[in-house]
Amino acid sequence: MAGMLKIDGIERTVPAAETIKRVATTAESLGVTRLADITGLDRIGIPVYSSVVPKSGDSLSVYNGKGARPVDAQAGALMEAIERQTALKARPPHIEASFSELSKSANALDPKSINQKLSDDYSDDRTYSWIEGTDLVTGELWWIPAKLAGYLWHDVPHPSCFEINDTNGLASGNCRQEAICHALCELAERDTWTFAELGAHHLPRQRRSLVYGHRAKDGPDDLDMFPCVDVGPNQLLDKFHAVDLFPVIRDLTSELQVPTIFASVADEHITNFPMAHSGMGAHPDVNVALRRALSELAQSRCVDIQGVREDILPPNASPEFFSLHTRRISAVDRSSWYLGRSENTRRLEDIPSHKFDSLESDIDFLVTRFRACGLDRIIVVDLTPDETMYSVVRVIVPGIELWATDHGRLGPRALAFWKKHA
């Protein structure tokens, strides 16, 4: 279909240099004081940049970007800072009502349809704040719990329906379609990651517990459930190989059928350095998913070496359940699906892939795949300030699985998967 055409190779509607030019003044007004090149902290050479917001109201003050070129990494770092700071400061009009009351007269999103842990004191009859969102498919208006759609809105009246406030589905772009596409890809990645973690790690433990009881934690993951990928010639992968690093690359693509690539590497050459890192990418085009996974893998190493990002935890930390994925790994376990290699392999070109010319076509594909899995409601909350040359949205999909990032709550699809394979 016709629409917002993409620039080949970066999946954006304008060149990265133009993005930087558009948002430079906004970034400064939102508190960005520095854009730092941290590529040289590591030996790989894939560009990674950090944008710094010293007086951030966020839990983070350093944001990161990566890419095949320095200009792409610069744009990514600025846009991540703008995305989070815009979401922090946005205050769309809200109403105050209970779910029971509001759902009688309007489309109100049931908090229980979201696969996150509800607050201990949640009640359908308790008053909460709500803001408007739009169903991406039907165009209908929906009322969404404000603190689900927003980010760290502590001053908005009434408590949150949920235990935590995350950034899943929060995305920015040069235009609304670009932001929505980024958000949908992120949600597809989170969903797919959940099924991979359950299938390759937790199900083998469950099976062993039937035989060995309390010793269920001992033993390998299922390394063959998700095949390793034979990538073939690839410039980003060559940068790893040139410094004696050989990433494990897996195809995690699930029932969503959105190509999802996971890349990890263990570095045992440097002492006193966190040994294992990973990256992931999901996109209709498997080559874009691979590029995102490899560049994120490089970024995770640089950010770890930089040592200033507040959400990176030491290996011996006892994190909250929602921050387990940010804890460093201090030992290489080749029996884990994250780092172990599989005898089950497939070629990159054999993974079903969908390369479209427009963002609208990407979005149509993603929406079709979500709906094929019973994820029929896709709601967009626009957090974009007036008269800006960028867009920030929160996309909310009831039923999407987020457990891999927060270990909060398994939804019906994940539970059905567990029962089928246990």
Language model features: what each stretch is:
Residues M1-A422:
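Helix-biased "structured C-terminal domain" signature
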